[in-house]
A protein has these predicted regions:
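Helical element adjacent to the flavin cofactor pocket in flavoenzyme catalytic cores
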Residues: 67-125
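Rossmann-like flavin
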Residues: 1-61
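A conserved FAD-binding loop/helix module that cradles the flavin
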Residues: 322-345
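Hydrophobic, well-ordered secondary-structure elements that form the walls
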Residues: 136, 170, 231, 259, ...
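A glycine-rich dinucleotide-binding beta-alpha-beta segment and adjacent secondary-structure elements
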Residues: 41-55, 204-212, 265-326
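C-terminal segments that line or cap access tunnels to active or ligand-binding sites in enzymes
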Residues: 173-283
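Active-site-adjacent "gating/activation" loops or surface patches in catalytic cores
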Residues: 46-79, 311-315
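Mid-domain catalytic core of redox enzymes
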Residues: 110-223
Length: 349
């Protein structure tokens, strides 16, 4: 609760007994050495440290505090919503509508009306005007500033971004008995591929990949006798010198080759429908540098040093999403929504 579940306005807010305990446990040391201190099997070392990649840093550079992600996975398990991940926002919307919230879909905010330090109305691409007492904004922060609020603050311009990824969503006729719902397939290389991804900003020569099979536990997510696959390969973000318009077809074939070499025999031939998302697609969806994991969780972009959820220079503009506090990931983003609401109506009792 001290570090994630509340609004933090200053590093001084963290000066609690829990901070002292965290320091004593080595939470501000590096993740990989800390994991290696307790786990000696190289396979387990990977399992309990790879999550740093999604925070935008290598396990060798990430803070040991991020071991909490693997801890939660191990102790609490990994949950899957019936109906797929989209069931979560559908349920949230239904609960909000029950309490009088009105949603306007397929409509984009293109400009804001301002009066001094307050935003007074949002204007959509359809010419609709919505007056507001306060406004919560959840696009990536650089996009919000450049396209809606005005001059981008220097603190936002200086942000360093996480790697990106390519995803392949597949409808397939192929079933594999040896796989689970969530599968992580590590390459033989470890430190080297993180250097490729983060420092050299090149494609990983021996990638570690995620394969999720939603239909493994929810048969409604694929036709009878079929399977649905979500495949994720980490890649550099758009700071890299990669022309994804040209690279995408070749990389799609490389992804299939890697999958087939990792035990998914005949994967390519069994594809019946597919959708590929590259860093260019993430950028088109409003994600700075084509980075779906937002700004990296380096030390000075974590906790109180991460961009606050209050817009500087405005009295009634609040942020939510992975680019602000507390950070990246579905649980964090859900918490960010509540923290944004608390900025407007006060702390939830």
């Amino acid at each position: 609760n001290d570090f994630i579940d509340r609004n933090i306005d200053s590093p001084l807010n963290l000066l609690t007994p829990n901070l002292a305990r965290l320091i004593a446990l080595g939470g501000f040391r590096k993740l990989q050495p800390k994991v290696n201190q307790f786990l000696k099997d190289p396979r387990l070392q990977k399992v309990y440290s790879f999550q740093a990649m999604y925070a935008g840093v290598s396990p060798q550079q990430a803070l040991a505090i991020y071991a909490v992600i693997a801890y939660m996975d191990s102790v609490n398990g990994v949950f899957f919503p019936k109906g797929g991940m989209h069931a979560v926002p559908r349920a949230l919307a239904a609960a909000a509508e029950k309490h009088g919230v009105k949603f306007v879909y397929n409509s984009s905010v293109t400009s804001l009306e301002k009066n001094g330090s307050r935003v007074t109305a949002a204007i959509t691409d359809k010419g609709e005007r919505y007056e507001c007492d306060a406004i919560v904004m959840n696009p990536d922060l650089p996009v919000v500033w450049k396209e809606l609020l005005g001059k981008e603050p220097l603190s936002i311009k200086r942000l360093k971004y996480s790697p990106s990824c390519v995803t392949l969503l597949v409808g397939s006729s192929k079933h594999y008995d040896h796989v689970a719902h969530h599968n992580i397939h590590f390459g033989d290389s470890w430190d080297g591929v993180f250097d490729e991804l983060i420092k050299k900003k090149t494609l990983m020569s021996d990638p570690s990949v995620l394969v999720t099979i939603p239909s493994h536990d929810d048969k409604s997510l694929a036709p009878a006798g079929k399977e649905s696959y979500y495949v994720l390969f980490p890649t550099p973000n758009l700071d890299a010198d990669i022309d994804w318009k040209k690279e995408a077809p070749r990389y799609r074939n490389e992804m299939i080759r890697v999958l087939e070499s990792r035990g998914y025999e005949g994967f390519g031939d069994a594809i019946e429908t597919e959708s590929m998302t590259t860093p260019l697609d993430w950028q088109a969806r409003g994600m700075e540098r084509g980075a779906p994991f937002a700004s990296a969780h380096t030390f000075f972009q974590t906790g109180p040093f991460r961009p606050r959820n209050i817009a500087a220079g405005f009295d009634n503009v609040v942020f939510a999403g992975s680019g602000t506090q507390p950070g990246v990931g579905v649980p964090m983003v859900l918490i960010s929504g509540r923290l944004a609401a608390e900025r407007i109506v006060g702390p939830v009792k």
